[in-house]
Amino acid sequence: MSETLPRSDDLEATWNFIEPGINQILGNEKNQASTSKRVYKILSPTMYMEVYTAIYNYCVNKSRSSGHFSTDSRTGQSTILVGSEIYEKLKNYLKNYILNFKQSNSETFLQFYVKRWKRFTIGAIFLNHAFDYMNRYWVQKERSDGKRHIFDVNTLCLMTWKEVMFDPSKDVLINELLDQVTLGREGQIIQRSNISTAIKSLVALGIDPQDLKKLNLNVYIQVFEKPFLKKTQEYYTQYTNDYLEKHSVTEYIFEAHEIIKREEKAMTIYWDDHTKKPLSMALNKVLITDHIEKLENEFVVLLDARDIEKITSLYALIRRDFTLIPRMASVFENYVKKTGENEISSLLAMHKHNIMKNENANPKKLALMTAHSLSPKDYIKKLLEVHDIFSKIFNESFPDDIPLAKALDNACGAFININEFALPAGSPKSATSKTSEMLAKYSDILLKKATKPEVASDMSDEDIITIFKYLTDKDAFETHYRRLFAKRLIHGTSTSAEDEENIIQRLQAANSMEYTGKITKMFQDIRLSKILEDDFAVALKNEPDYSKAKYPDLQPFVLAENMWPFSYQEVEFKLPKELVPSHEKLKESYSQKHNGRILKWLWPLCRGELKADIGKPGRMPFNFTVTLFQMAILLLYNDADVLTLENIQEGTSLTIQHIAAAMVPFIKFKLIQQVPPGLDALVKPETQFKLSRPYKALKTNINFASGVKNDILQSLSGGGHDNHGNKLGNKRLTEDERIEKELNTERQIFLEACIVRIMKAKRNLPHTTLVNECIAQSHQRFNAKVSMVKRAIDSLIQKGYLQRGDDGESYAYLA
């Protein structure tokens, strides 16, 4: 360069002065340094400053000159010429400079492009500094005047590169880039650095003329991203199809994860963040969606194998596309439901097989025996087994996934409430699932003192609550539970009050205080009865004529009639004379404390203990647990060894049916001998009943009361069996029907109350809306059928609470 700076008003001289410097800054064939540090070392500081000064002098001089104006052909505006001429010179120079690039035979276009791009962009930065004064004043003024075709020098370099180098050759460049991507996917060595630089150039060339600071990815997206995504889909479509022909689906799942891992790594190294989402969607389509049926089938195979690790891997793959989760949830729900149903069917089949080995029964009788002799523990444990298996799979493979959690709940609710045992084929639509009753019996086994430790060792209150949450007929469970709970309370057979209270609290937490209201009140009655018993015992001991012989121990229970599952039936019965003094004193004592209250005596539910010294001389007396009716009969034998049925009737005032039912256990265990024997003679007045003296039995403590619970004729002639091997009869079926009737009545009352509440608030409602709201409100207690709601509506219309609208499809509330 010349040692003398050019005249500041001479454009040609100024350009001729700075052109060699620009050439040196941008580089030539011999000067292709690829980093800023290397370029800085090559450039002469003196030359750099002279270029800057010459440009500065020219722009300043022109700005001071007057009368030098130019009219812009695009806008028609006049501008002081402080840079436009030298700007145009530079623009033309850059075009020619880039056009003169030559690709060698030894390099690919990608290599050529990247090498030139690196040097050119470094030079553009230095050049931008050299033209700093023009950028800050002339360019900025032009752009502020709305001339968006004027750019700072660095941007001008990039725009020229795009126009001259990139646009004509972009297809070649992109094809070579995509070839490199394919080679990388095939595990071959690729030009990693060149790929990265070329991609960055595409981002850099996305310039928005209206706003140079705004990121514009239009070039990157249109030129590279779209063909890249298309190529990706084509490549992996072919790859996955070929892979699945030679490998198992399980192997494919792990391969798909590896592909995704590699592509995500490449994403962070090469591609712009904008590609992340569309690339993920493209991979999801070709790796997952296109093979979803195979993956769903494999899901079933893995569930069969209970292979949690592989299920987790499959879920991790499928969840990448959230739209596929409902399909996976549907497969999971159907599988769990079917498995639960099959497990119960297998349990029943095994149970039937065991019965057939021991009994010769016709199909109808076999079905009845199976239904009434299946162990509640076996049944509930089988339900829990299925639930626990799939809960574990859920918790370890896809925790917190809402659709799959819902699928598990739906499936468990389905097979727990509806299976071959709970609702056998042909059951009426109004039938209640037997699961509620079986869970109540399971609870009874757990909470009963008499249950052997080895039986209860693997049972817990958690089991009860787990199944309870899935019950659709929670009111049926409450009814059965309350009946068994009542027996435990009045017979004192509960393991402990704490255990009972714990279950009540957990049931309350799982449902509502209202749900356990009756059970809680029953518990309170027992506590108050204990206080009454203690007070009565103290009062008796204060009697002047007190003796244990005159006042035997008495354990009274005072129960609220509408809370307990016992229906009062007046029974003609003469209380044994040995119990009359205690009975009279109790009535007197209670009346004094609770004036006006009426006591109704439930004689059929009373039990007691008798000491019988009727064994061989020297043997300890027997302890008999008996019903009150049995006690009344046995006490008659203090005065005679042989009694006729007529004698017993006179002594007890009991009906023949009650006497016969009480006698069955005595005859069965040979405490009493019937003469003549046989069913027909059992109910004849002249039949004699002789007490066995001396009585021979291995046990000292004998429970005769338990044998009274079944129908007399069935007990003697054979029939079904309960869970403990006792013979079953018609009373059991009658009791089931009675419970079902009670449930239906309570449900009718509940639904009517629901309808009144709803209609009182809404006043007028269409039929469908009323039915749906009523079903929704009853969901926590039972699964209300439409027919049940219709009956309740009809009942309320008859009672005058509702009236049908003129359209026949709506109802109005009558205040």
Curated annotation (Swiss-Prot):
Pfam families: Cullin, Cullin_Nedd8. It is found in: Cytoplasm; Nucleus. GO terms for molecular function: DNA replication origin binding; protein-macromolecule adaptor activity; ubiquitin protein ligase binding. Residues 9-280 are annotated as: Required for interaction with SKP1/CBF3D and F-box protein. Its main location: cytoplasm. GO terms for cellular component: chromosome, telomeric region; cytoplasm; nucleus; SCF ubiquitin ligase complex. Residues 448-748 are annotated as: Required for interaction with CDC34/UBC3. Neddylated; enhancing the ubiquitin-ligase activity. GO terms for biological process: cell division; cellular response to methylmercury; G1/S transition of mitotic cell cycle; G2/M transition of mitotic cell cycle; mitochondrial fusion; mitotic intra-S DNA damage checkpoint signaling; positive regulation of D-glucose transmembrane transport; protein ubiquitination. InterPro entries: Cullin (IPR045093), Cullin_CS (IPR016157), Cullin_homology (IPR016158), Cullin_homology_sf (IPR036317), Cullin_N (IPR001373), Cullin_neddylation_domain (IPR019559), Cullin_repeat-like_dom_sf (IPR016159), WH-like_DNA-bd_sf (IPR036388). SMART domains: CULLIN, Cullin_Nedd8. Keywords: Cell cycle, Cell division, Cytoplasm, Isopeptide bond, Nucleus, Ubl conjugation. There is a cross-link at K760 (Glycyl lysine isopeptide (Lys-Gly) (interchain with G-Cter in NEDD8)). Residues 746-807 form the Cullin neddylation domain. Core component of multiple cullin-RING-based SCF (SKP1-CUL1-F-box) E3 ubiquitin-protein ligase complexes which mediate the ubiquitination and subsequent proteasomal degradation of target proteins. As a scaffold protein may contribute to catalysis through positioning of the substrate and the ubiquitin-conjugating enzyme. The SCF complex associates with CDC34 as the E2 ubiquitin-conjugating enzyme. The functional specificity of the SCF complex depends on the type of F-box protein. Present with 377 molecules/cell in log phase SD medium. Belongs to the cullin family. Component of multiple SCF (SKP1-CUL1-F-box) E3 ubiquitin-protein ligase complexes formed of CUL1, SKP1/HRT1, RBX1 and a variable F-box domain-containing protein as substrate-specific adapter. Component of the SCF(CDC4) complex containing CDC4. Component of the SCF(MET30) complex containing MET30. Component of the SCF(GRR1) complex containing GRR1. Component of the probable SCF(DIA2) complex containing DIA2. Component of the probable SCF(YDR131C) complex containing YDR131C. Component of the probable SCF(YDR306C) complex containing YDR306C. PANTHER family: CULLIN. This is Cell division control protein 53. It comes from Saccharomyces cerevisiae (strain ATCC 204508 / S288c). The lineage of its organism: Eukaryota, Fungi, Dikarya, Ascomycota, Saccharomycotina. The gene is CDC53.
